[in-house]
Amino acid sequence: MPRQSGFGWAWRVPLALAGSLAAATASGYLLTRGLPLDDPLERLYAGLFGALGVGLLLLVGGLLARGPGNFAWRLGGSLLVLGLALWLLAGRG
């Protein structure tokens, strides 16, 4: 079986880990700061669990993608869904 070149595991795992950690940190910070909740503890929990969800979504998407193009489409779709969910959540406040 010939070896496949390109987006192999040597690059996939570090990129998926770095990207998911960076996105989880940024989304957790933005959720904690921007959610229209009265209780600070509720905002903290929402930010933590939101960051965990975003990080896991991007990590799994990065590890299961067949190539860089596939990963870009998955990332764009997941960010679109996340943005829509945050927009709907902010509209309730």
Swiss-Prot record:
Its main location: membrane. The keyword Transmembrane applies. May play some role in transport of Fe(3+)-pyochelin. The keyword Oxidoreductase does not apply. It is a multi-pass membrane protein. This is Protein FptB. It comes from Pseudomonas aeruginosa (strain ATCC 15692 / DSM 22644 / CIP 104116 / JCM 14847 / LMG 12228 / 1C / PRS 101 / PAO1). It comes from the Bacteria. The chain crosses the membrane at residues 44-64, 71-91. Keywords: Cell membrane, Membrane, Signal, Transmembrane, Transmembrane helix. Residues 1-25 form the signal peptide. It is found in: Cell membrane. Coiled coil: none annotated. GO terms for cellular component: plasma membrane.
